[in-house]
Amino acid sequence: ACSAFLELHRLITQRSDELRKEELFYVLFSRLFGKYTHTSLQSRPLRSSQIKEACKYLESHASETITLDDICQRVSVSKSSLIRSFSKQLGLTPHGYLMSIRVKEAQTFLKQGIPPSLAALKSGFADQAHFSNVFNRLTGLTPGSYQNVFLKKAPSSNDSD
């Protein structure tokens, strides 16, 4: 809970993703509630069709600002149910899933020669630093390095002497 609280504090003091802030808030609240009341927040597990619907929503709105309320309203569930079931079924939080979608979109833009700063904006990242951090964490490369790998020209047959 301490590391989640510190991350939430960092996200609040910086301009960052609202979806991640909301997720951390609900995770912390659920943990604290369970610890200090000796009960846990019971949430109804989502059906796989609801998870698929949430995924489709995230995929089709990936470049937009998305909140937990948006997703929950779409699939008619509570925030705690969404986070818990999504994580259990996919191994990622809704935010983690959204970040993976955005990075895949950015990879497509980078392969097309679009500058990293523009690829970040077009794929839904609010700022270059956040984009670079997430991209590096998920791919192991910086956006510029990734682009260089894909934009290197293959040697032509005329170059071999």
Sequence positions of predicted segments:
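Aromatic/histidine-rich interaction motifs
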Residues: 1-6, 18
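Conserved small-residue packing positions in alpha-helical repeats and bundles
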Residues: 8-9, 106
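Short, Lys/Arg-enriched, Trp-marked, Pro/Gly-tolerant hinge/linker segments that flank
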Residues: 10-75, 88-100
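Short, charged alpha-helical segments
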Residues: 20-23, 130-134
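Terminal helix-turn-helix DNA-binding modules in bacterial transcription factors
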Residues: 56, 60, 64-69, 77, ...
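Proline-centered helix-kink/hinge sites
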Residues: 94, 142-143
